[in-house]
Regions:
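Nucleotide-sugar donor-binding/catalytic module of glycosyltransferases
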Residues: 1-172
Length: 172
């Protein structure tokens, strides 16, 4: 059900060895690619190029996933993308997230309850207004892989803060 693509872009801290160990331990799930460092965008581009799944989610090296929330998300994806051929599968799943400010010892919860109907699918007409403090970042998004590819999104290399390109360019 899940494919994990680990993109090692020239890490010097033992990441490459650890990634390779995961690939050996979980060969049906984990694929590793080693490449020259090209920055965050380059790693995302490589992952998208190699992705074989219906959906694509970026998880950076400093991100973490809550197991219970992750399993709930997988169940929701399966529910919406069930075996009913007549059903249109969603182009995008949007998830709440927690932003950890480790330096300050603070957390900020970003939820979208006021924007999107909870636990259901909607179209553009079902979206309400964002608060000024709310925005979509790549870590809250799970795009259908085909949507990303058709959009032609390609993140710049050696550039920080490329979330807006990834988050908004694929939208109609």
């Amino acid at each position: 059900d899940v494919e994990i693509i680990l993109v090692d872009d020239g890490s010097t801290d033992g990441t490459a060895r650890i990634a390779d160990e995961y690939e050996v331990a979980f060969p049906d799930i984990v694929r590793v690619v080693h490449k020259k460092n090209g920055g965050h965008g380059s790693g995302v581009n490589k992952g998208l190029e190699l992705a074989r799944g219906i959906y694509f989610k970026v998880v950076d090296s400093d991100d973490w996933l809550d197991r219970e929330a992750y399993l709930k998300l997988l169940a929701r994806i399966k529910e919406f993308c069930g075996e009913k051929e007549s059903r249109k599968i969603p182009d995008l799943f949007i998830c709440n997230y927690i932003y950890d400010h480790l330096d300050e010892g603070k957390q900020r919860v970003m939820d979208y309850k006021n924007v999107f109907p909870e636990e259901s699918m909607c179209d553009w007409n079902g979206i309400r207004h964002f608060r000024p403090s709310q925005y979509l970042i790549m870590h809250a998004l799970i795009f259908r892989t085909e949507v990303l590819r058709k959009s032609g999104v390609k993140l710049p290399e050696h550039t920080f803060y490329v979330d807006n390109l990834f988050s908004y360019q694929p939208l109609p």
